């Protein structure tokens, strides 16, 4: 908190404020965390602004309409455990979330977190399956284009399935034309297809 005050308009201060907001999120103080994150969305550091926006959206999209935060509390706990590299414990909590709240808007976020953990564990087949679940569950999800892009990257770089990667990049370009991943997907698609790039 002191760094946040001493370096209020500096990247270091913004990083400190983000870490504080993330800590509030981990503790379950979602409204306060979101208020802090909303301030950071206009941060000068693009990385901090993107991280703040991402976490703020996660909170706002998944706060219950009746203001219950039980599912979000579970997810935040799993997120904290993953942050602390206690991935097996995080997976247990994410499984609990799927069992207790099978129709909650956090289901796809939980699968995405599980996919990230599977990537760290180098279990690429399970990671691919989880991205597939996200896309089958809700192709209009806020994270659907992220899942599709990560799945394409996975096939290109780790599963060495260039044909599948090509198909997935094309799907992203066609189905999510407004995605931030379109430009990079188009480049990767052309490179995999063998086009001469400038």
Residue map of PLM features:
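Acidic, polar-rich low-complexity tracts and alpha-helical solenoid repeat scaffolds
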Residues: 1-198
């Amino acid at each position: 908190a002191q760094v946040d005050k001493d370096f209020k308009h500096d990247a270091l201060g913004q990083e400190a404020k983000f870490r504080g907001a993330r800590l509030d999120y981990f503790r379950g103080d979602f409204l306060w965390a979101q208020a802090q994150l909303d301030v950071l969305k206009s941060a000068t550091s693009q990385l901090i602004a993107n991280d703040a926006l991402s976490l703020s959206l996660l909170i706002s999209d998944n706060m219950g309409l009746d203001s219950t935060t039980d599912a979000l509390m579970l997810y935040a706990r799993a997120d904290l455990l993953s942050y602390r590299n206690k991935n097996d414990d995080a997976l247990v909590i994410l499984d609990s979330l799927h069992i207790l709240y099978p129709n909650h808007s956090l289901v796809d976020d939980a699968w995405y977190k599980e996919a990230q953990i599977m990537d760290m564990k180098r279990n690429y087949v399970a990671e691919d399956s989880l991205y597939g679940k996200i896309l089958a569950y809700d192709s209009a999800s806020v994270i659907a284009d992220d899942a599709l892009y990560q799945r394409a990257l996975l096939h290109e770089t780790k599963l060495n399935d260039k044909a599948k990667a090509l198909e997935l990049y094309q799907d992203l370009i066609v189905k999510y034309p407004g995605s931030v991943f379109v430009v990079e997907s188009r480049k990767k698609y052309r490179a995999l297809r063998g086009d001469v790039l400038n």
